[in-house]
Amino acid sequence: MKLGVMTALFGSRSLEDMLKHCKASGLDAVEICAGNYPGMPHAKIPELVKSADAAKKFKATVEKAGLEISALSCHGNPLHPDAAIAKEHHANHRNAVELAKMIGVDVVINFSGCPGDSDTAKHPNWVTCPWPDDFSKIRDWQWEKKVIPYWKQEAKFAADRGIRLAFEMHPGFCVYNTETMLRLRESCGDNIGANFDPSHLFWQGMDPLVSLRALKGAIFHVHAKDCRIDTQNTLKNGTLDAKPYGDVVNRSWVSCTVGYGHGEQFWRDFVSELRVLGYDGVISIEHEDGLMSVDEGFGKAVAFLKNIILTEKPAAMWWA
């Protein structure tokens, strides 16, 4: 396994400075932001797609720093009911897939997106319950008319270029748990899989280790981010919490640096399960911790994971 980082947290640094800092911190890889919600802080993706020389130079810059690119990330909502937003997010997704092919990266990360409740909707509508029946009808319409047709088309577009699409199971979007991830994969193709981020699963009451096992063969990329559950607030209000992330004292849960939500034993079990299932790729740190600075959160995550990830190939079992 290798250790990397999702580079959004270093958006204020230049590409060269960011790469230098990542290498000096002991990382092996970077996950490059390719538009939509993460932005494009280190590379103007549309410009790179238009120029093979520019794309080659970008890749060479990363490699010269002693790093590799684990994935291109364009987390967005190409199914947004606002046509302008959907068009922009779709274009950024397509550009990320094209650039990935050009620079020899085989994973592009996204969200599944979430449509509205009809073709006349203005805002996404994330369904969390089956009744009244309106909600079941909305969910069925979203999947049958929007989610599956769109991603079946995009899965083919990516497959034709040798690219795998890794979806982050994230509340607010149609793929948010194990069964919705599997439904998308089964409906659209084997190059559809997961960017596995356990933080979004904890507060839903899921066991990430059980989810990992169910997704064997469909884990394309991994995020290292934790989630701290506030027991008092959860017992009072439950976990469907729409308060601002900055309202830490009142929220039922918050994202946090690895080790600050779940201890070493969970993360040791997590990387062990990944290896059992055949994943030996990059573990990419994602910093979203409202209680720490970028540098402190990143530094603590690197130190924590360095002692946990498995970096060497397992030895032959001479005892078996």
Predicted regions and their residues:
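Boundary/entry segment of secreted carbohydrate-active catalytic domains
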Residues: 1-12
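Acidic/histidine-rich catalytic cores of soluble enzymes
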Residues: 2, 29-30, 36, 72, ...
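Conserved, mostly hydrophobic/aromatic
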Residues: 5, 22, 30, 62, ...
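A short, acidic, flexible beta-alpha connecting loop/helix-capping segment that sits on the rim
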Residues: 10, 284-293
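Active-site acidic/histidine proton-transfer and metal-coordination neighborhood
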Residues: 16-17, 21, 56-64, 68, ...
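A structural motif
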Residues: 27, 67, 100, 105, ...
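Glycine-rich, proline-tolerant flexible connector loops at the mouths of alpha/beta enzymes
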Residues: 32-57, 113-119
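C-terminal helical cap(s) of enzyme catalytic domains, especially alpha/beta-barrels
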Residues: 294-317
